[in-house]
């Protein structure tokens, strides 16, 4: 199976980061020298994705503008002798074929994915959640794509989390080991109680699914919060066809909340060629007075 297409859901309101997100989409908040969503698009491209659909909503037009060409800006930069900056601006629009679709109604992640059925067609596809940034040597989505292609099945990213977190995520039941850090999935449930959980392995923001999910989502009833939950659809999918979990290598940041966003800023800045050295020294000096 060849994975060429990806969906990035970016229709959320970003209420956990208000007032920042009152007028700026949370996906456009800066993470060192690029907006959050650019890192996600770059991860998709590095995993071999050729076409990307970003699911948006009212107030998200800055995302569309960002991935479009800006000829006036490029011309001005070149005129001012800033050729490198002009090339950087153009490179954003050249990264991949990026398309946009409005969710229109906030009916949950499952509904947002179902809206993309025409874009996907009959191909396997990837999902990268717009809040989740990954820091890893091999892109996390590439780890999933390889597992999906090796095992000819859907693949989802998982990580073991403590009890206080598993109740906030989806818990998966792991069965036989299929490869290095790859397991067959037997079942899953959305935000379980501690008595309901299958394990402490949580689904974290990256998926490769077969197009069979669309027929399932079309009849999936609203679940928690009266929304169509992607996990409910995947639960049915994994009962009807093989699905695997990838205990991915790397670190995940939830940039949709202040703690995760600030942690990502620090870690990505420390790895930045321009900022890393002086920031490291700045932190050392600051730490003396903490």
Regions found by a protein language model. Give the residues of each.
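Positively charged, low-complexity intrinsically disordered leader regions
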Residues: 1-6, 278-284
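Residue-level signal for inorganic ion chemistry
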Residues: 37, 63, 116, 131, ...
